């Protein structure tokens, strides 16, 4: 259940491991990859930032290798172009050192600390006091990769089906099979796998999971460089992230279509699947604001939240953030681009769950938390779930 890239990769990996299994993939939208997958930065992450030994670190690194190989084999538009993580202030150097050490522990290939002159050789318009060169980072068409995974899986088994515009309304659990009531009728299945992204908590509860945490959505807005300014960014430029927040900071990304995006910021959204600055859902807002963890998150990060909101509605403030890395950017160089929404699994104490989280409930597997770098890690997550399904469900 769920047709983003994690759901697609899981569908694909299950079908490869169990070619005789008849699998149905339900997606409530008219298109695959229509939410987080289709609105992210399009970056193949290296695994640089993640705690050694965590699910994020292990699956990102394995998943990156698999994703690049998959893209090469199936003609998915991608480019392993590398990125620089740059420090613009001396106060950022301890965090940069910490990130570099984490990268070494995670055995990220080819990373090196570089000075300001070396940064300029890679990105001539960047002003920094040094950085980290990460040659194995890249860019990819995640929508295309998602579609190809599903296409291959469907071609392997005539009995497997894709159901688009089919929203799961409720689930009745039986001793042998579950009945999935959808917007297009009822279906029976023996085993269920949920990769529902922004709706992960709601579907888990519909499946009987007693979940204390709740998903909260954060919108990220992007600007684009004008055609005349695109030469100021060669590939990928990231700031040194603040370790107190679950975001990597506003960065520059050359996309696979040649456009250059700047962003995203991170603001609480009043609609989980809302991409406009004024989008509103009464249910989503009610659920978020009646949950104690949301208020604790707000109070614990008050100044960060206020600054992000101000920047969301001020091109001038957004530009000022970008100019920390590329000082010669001007107001005329950027124009508003698209937005994305990120699902964060939030605990009652206001803490965001950082690592991937996959849980089991009877004959169900739930991907409850799959923040960045889940798209990069998707094939590894899919393999992990396929392997766990063998153990949990005794599949042969």
Residue ranges and their predicted role:
Residues 1-6, 24:
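Beta1/beta-strand and adjacent pyrophosphate-binding region of the FAD-binding site
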Residues 15-39:
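Glycine-rich FAD pyrophosphate-binding loop
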Residues 9, 171-281:
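Flavin-dependent oxidoreductases
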Residues 51-62, 86-95, 132-151, 163, ...:
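Short beta-strand to alpha-helix junction loop
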Residues 297-396:
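C-terminal catalytic lobe of FAD-dependent flavoproteins
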Residues 132-191, 195-196, 202, 377-390:
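Helical element adjacent to the flavin cofactor pocket in flavoenzyme catalytic cores
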Residues 42-118, 122, 128, 249-250, ...:
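Dinucleotide-binding Rossmann-like beta1-alpha1 core, especially the glycine-rich loop
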Residues 105, 210-212, 229-230, 255-339:
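Flavin-binding catalytic cores
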């Amino acid at each position: 259940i769920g047709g983003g890239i994690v759901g697609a990769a899981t569908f694909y990996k299950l079908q490869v491991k169990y070619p005789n299994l008849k699998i149905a993939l339900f997606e409530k939208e008219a298109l695959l990859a229509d939410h987080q997958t289709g609105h992210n930065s399009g970056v193949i992450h290296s695994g640089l930032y993640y705690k050694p030994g965590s699910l994020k670190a292990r699956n990102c690194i394995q998943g990156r290798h698999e994703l690049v190989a998959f893209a090469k084999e199936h003609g998915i538009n991608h480019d392993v172009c590398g990125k620089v993580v740059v420090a613009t202030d001396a106060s950022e150097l301890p965090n940069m050192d910490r990130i570099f050490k984490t990268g070494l522990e995670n055995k990220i290939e080819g990373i090196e600390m570089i000075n300001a002159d070396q940064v300029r050789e890679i990105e001539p318009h960047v002003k920094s006091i040094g950085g980290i060169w990460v040659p194995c980072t890249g860019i990819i068409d995640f929508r295309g990769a998602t579609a190809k995974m599903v296409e291959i899986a469907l071609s392997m088994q005539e009995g497997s089906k894709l159901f688009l515009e089919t929203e799961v309304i409720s689930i009745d659990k039986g001793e042998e099979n579950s009945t999935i009531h959808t917007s297009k009728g009822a279906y029976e299945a023996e085993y269920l796998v949920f990769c529902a992204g922004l709706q992960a908590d709601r579907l888990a509860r519909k499946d009987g999971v007693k979940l204390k945490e709740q998903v909260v959505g954060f919108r990220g807005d992007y600007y684009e460089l004008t055609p005349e300014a695109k030469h100021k960014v060669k590939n990928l430029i990231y700031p040194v992230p603040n370790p107190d927040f679950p975001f990597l900071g506003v960065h520059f990304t050359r996309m696979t279509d040649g456009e250059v995006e700047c962003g995203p910021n991170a603001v609480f959204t009043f609609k989980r699947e809302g991409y406009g600055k004024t989008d509103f859902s009464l249910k989503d807002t009610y659920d978020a604001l009646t949950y104690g963890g949301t208020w604790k998150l707000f109070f614990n990060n008050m100044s960060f939240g206020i600054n992000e909101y101000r920047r969301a509605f001020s091109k001038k403030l957004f530009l000022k953030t970008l100019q920390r890395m590329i000082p010669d950017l001007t107001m005329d160089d950027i124009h508003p681009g698209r937005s994305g929404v990120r699902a964060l699994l939030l605990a009652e104490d206001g803490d965001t769950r950082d690592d991937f989280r996959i849980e089991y409930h009877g004959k169900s597997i739930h991907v409850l938390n799959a923040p960045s770098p889940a798209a990069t890690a998707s094939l590894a997550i899919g393999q992990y779930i396929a392997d766990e399904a063998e153990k949990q469900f005794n599949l042969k």
